[in-house]
Amino acid sequence: MKIGMIVAMDKELKQLRPLFPENQVIIQKSGIATVNAAIQAVEMIRQYKPDCIISSGCAGGNGDDINLQDVVVSSELTYHDVYCGKAIDETTVYGQVQGLPVRYQADPYLLEKAKLTGAKPGLIVTGDWFVDSKDKMREIVSHFPEA
C-alpha cells in the first residue's frame, strides 16, 4: 500500500520523517490551514497516486480520557468553524457546508488498523482557527460535546 502523509508544520515533519522510510511513506508539509492541506492532497495524488492519505499533526483535546502525546484517530470529522446559516437550507447544521455531509466518516479499514496500535478513535473537529483560549474551546465543545 502506498501511503501519503500530510502535516502542517516543520516541527511535525521533523518528528515523523525519521519514523518512516521515504520508500514506504510519502510525507509532505502543506502549511497551516485546511485550504493548504487540500491543495497539498491534490498535488500528492497527482504526483504519487497514494492508496491513502493521512493528515497528521499536533492538536488539542477535550476528552478526560485523552492524555498528552496520545494518538487520536478520527472515526468521523467535521468543521468547528463553518456555519452557513439557514437562509438557503433549513436542514444545514453548525459545522456543515451546505449540500455536503454533516460529518465525514473515516475509512473503516484504516480506522481498524489504527485502533490495533492503541490509537483512540473519536470525532475530530477541524478548522482554520487555532484554538488558543479556554473560551474558544468551550464554544467548540458546546457544538460538539463528544469531540
Model regions and ranges:
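Glycine-rich phosphate- or other oxyanion-binding loops that anchor nucleotides, phosphorylated ligands
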Residues: 2-3, 7, 14, 18-147
